[in-house]
């Protein structure tokens, strides 16, 4: 949203420096950028009044004008169509430097045009660098009638503009009034309404229409005004709209736009001859129907979409845009002016079905002030009557009523608890009151807070805490220890910190997937309807589709490799209800590392993804004896390169090489290795034990290697864990050295070589002690290996 500083200052009881305004916006959470337009010379371009004009003797399209700057007269040859006696315009004197439409500089000089001397040049706003104030092509800029003569034209036109980036929760700031109101909360000025918006109430008639949908539109107002026309707006109104980045159209439309940009209430104008005011109302479309809009675009309005209609036909998309057939045009002399409050959810749904965006829709989707509907309509009517003194205004027809303001219970001690410092209830109460919140009652430090009608973002108690915190410049030193994070939050932080610091890139993908991306997962996903999107309709039950799509995008853009992870929410459906699970996904593809003079090309493998899981478990102090890797079968993975992880008899996740057909479907030429773990399961199975660091051993260790013949279906890791389960006091570790399997298809056995490391913490073991312990462990292991099948009992 772009606002001019001069327009914004009119809403303050006293002017504020631009620096203080920017600091206030930053304090309340509004990002701003400042632009100052001052592009021309101060002294050489002045204000002057056209006294008279006569036709040029040698040119049909030129006139010879006499201008007066308050002290002397000038003869100027001018070709602007609006050059006429009585107007005050910018006059560029000899020596003034201007720029043409291509940005090239030129200097004004005395010259003769078709034989007549010209002592300068009459200027348009665009020629002075103020293109936003230019309302007509090749026209002169017209100052108000009370503009002093001989003053610097550039000084009068120069202004500072503030570009505000509003977050969705700050819809109440999408107007000069709303922005000024927020700024006054953190400054020492009061909010005031400019005179044109302070109006006496007009006559209203409350009506009932059978088709009016109160849930869609709680209050709907319209008024008939006759004796108007599509004449051009006064220069003052055109300048005001130009400062708000709005193009002037005609007087009636300009008034409605000015009210919307100033007060935040969208208005719409109909041709009274095309609309029946007595049956005009808001409802949902009963069937699909075509509609041609003001922008000449023909759309199909689906059944259930919010519309405005009378007894005969549809005249507009509610809260978005009117129809072309019912619009105000050059021949209109009688209008119907509409002001209403639509529920934000209804207009958001309409924009989903009919994606037409407008300034009105921008405000309605974020929520406007329902209590401002009638005051804004009063202001528009008074402005129209000012421009058209003979206009006749009928009583305002009101359908419905203003919705009641909501009330929240608020514990004052919650602010101190969140801030981590003591805070008196009176401080909280006074701060809320200064922000426009009325306290209806107070009991035991619990306030009953009435929410202002324009604050649609205040829904819960914590929102009130945020209001107090964001607008109050607290400067109290907090010596209290920070609050303890939830176990899941702490676990996620540890996982993210480790993986990111270890070299993986963190990805963020959307929880909702389009059908094409969701198809990358070979499991069936549950589809849901979402009003915010036509494409993203599948709620993910795995991180795989999003990560796979992101990997394909990066590899197709010539990234040498993708080593990435994501921590996010997945959704499973149990008993017709969705259950949220916090999951970790790791994906590897491409090269193992970037090729350089010191490194060679090394391919990734199944063991690369397995190594990341093991390093993560080691970082999280998950003992290697606590988890088991078991065979697994899933359509997403390569049939012989996948495994499932069990931790304390709970399924923790799965990992492996993705199926080549799946990679081909994702348009990835490289092998892809993927792991997905449930952080919920990991959190629930982790033991809260004190992890102690051990010093390096001072006594030497010894190792013995053994080779066992077992059935090919026996996991090698099960032999390692079986040896560790015997609880030998000297057995320090067991590791797998090699696995050999004969290529002969008739052979169903394999050889597994293990290394056993023996060590005592208090002395050096003798060879005899090591041999005896080694033989004992080997005998115990052989006793559990089935001699006929080679399996472990």
From Swiss-Prot:
Residues 697-793 form the FDX-ACB domain. Coiled coil: none annotated. CDD domains: PheRS_beta_core (cd00769), tRNA_bind_bactPheRS (cd02796). The keyword Metal-binding applies. GO terms for biological process: phenylalanyl-tRNA aminoacylation. Its cofactor is Mg(2+). It catalyses: tRNA(Phe) + L-phenylalanine + ATP = L-phenylalanyl-tRNA(Phe) + AMP + diphosphate + H(+). It is found in: Cytoplasm. Residues 403-481 form the B5 domain. Binds 2 magnesium ions per tetramer. GO terms for cellular component: phenylalanine-tRNA ligase complex. Its EC number is 6.1.1.20. Gene3D superfamilies: 3.30.56.10, Bira Bifunctional Protein, Domain 2 (3.30.930.10), Ferrodoxin-fold anticodon-binding domain (3.30.70.380), Nucleic acid-binding proteins (2.40.50.140), Phenylalanyl-trna Synthetase, Chain B, domain 3 (3.50.40.10). Tetramer of two alpha and two beta subunits. HAMAP family: Phe_tRNA_synth_beta1. PANTHER family: PHENYLALANINE--TRNA LIGASE BETA SUBUNIT, PHENYLALANYL-TRNA SYNTHETASE BETA CHAIN AND LEUCINE-RICH REPEAT-CONTAINING PROTEIN 47. This is Phenylalanine--tRNA ligase beta subunit. The lineage of its organism: Bacteria, Pseudomonadati, Chlamydiota, Chlamydiia, Chlamydiales. The gene is pheT.
